[in-house]
Amino acid sequence: MNGTSSPASVPKPSPGAPTRRDFLYVATGTVAAIGAAATLIPLVDQLNPDASTLAQGGPVDLDVGKIQPRQQTIVRWRERPIFVFHRTPKALQALQNEKLLDQLADPRSVERQQPPYADNWHRSAKPEYGILVGICTHLGCIPRFDQLADEAAIVANWPGGYFCPCHGSKYDLAGRVFKGVPAPYNLPVPPYRFTSDTTVRIGENPPNVKFELESVQQI
C-alpha cells in the first residue's frame, strides 16, 4: 500500500511504556472530541462507567437502548475510546454495497482484528450496533465520526464512516479500512457480549469464547 508503513514497522507497545502512539492518542483527543461533539447527543456523563470500574480495567456495561438510530456514543474501557454506533437498515444495506466493497482494503475482515462473533460483514454481534475500538491502526490517533445525510448513498471515495484527522485514513461504519490510506488494518472490535436485549458488557466475551484484544494484528 503506497505511503503505508509495513505492519512490522509499527511495533506493539510494551505494557506500561509510553510510546509515540500513546502521545498521539492524547494529543489528538481534543481534536477528535470537537468533531464528535457535533454528532453526539450528550449522553457521555450518564453512560460512562464509575471511577472504580475504570481503575480496575474491568468490563463496562452500557445501555444501548438509550442510543438512538444514527447516534454514536463513546465510552472508555481500559483507557481506550470505544465507539458504539446504532446503525439503521439503510446503513446496513450500504455496508453490503459492491461499490463500497471495491474501495475497501479488507472487506471480508480476513485479518484478525475482531473476535469470532464479529467475523461477519457487519463485524458485530448484532447488526444494528457497531462496537469498535476508536484508535486508528496507523499511529493511534482517534478517528472522527462522519456520516452522510443519505446513509444509502455511496459517493466516490467516501460513503461516510470514520476519518482520521492525523494522516487521512478512512473507515466505513463497520470499521473496515479503505484502500490507499496509511492505516494497514480495520479498526479492532473489543471483546463484548449482550447480557440482555439492550445491555452490552464491553470487555467480556460470551460464554465459551476466548478472545483478548491484545491478540489482534494492530491496535
Identify what each model region corresponds to:
Residues 21-25, 51-52:
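Non-catalytic localization and substrate-recognition regions of ubiquitin/SUMO ligases
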Residues 1-18:
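N-terminal secretory signal peptides
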Residues 102-211, 215-219:
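Rieske [2Fe-2S] iron-sulfur-binding domain
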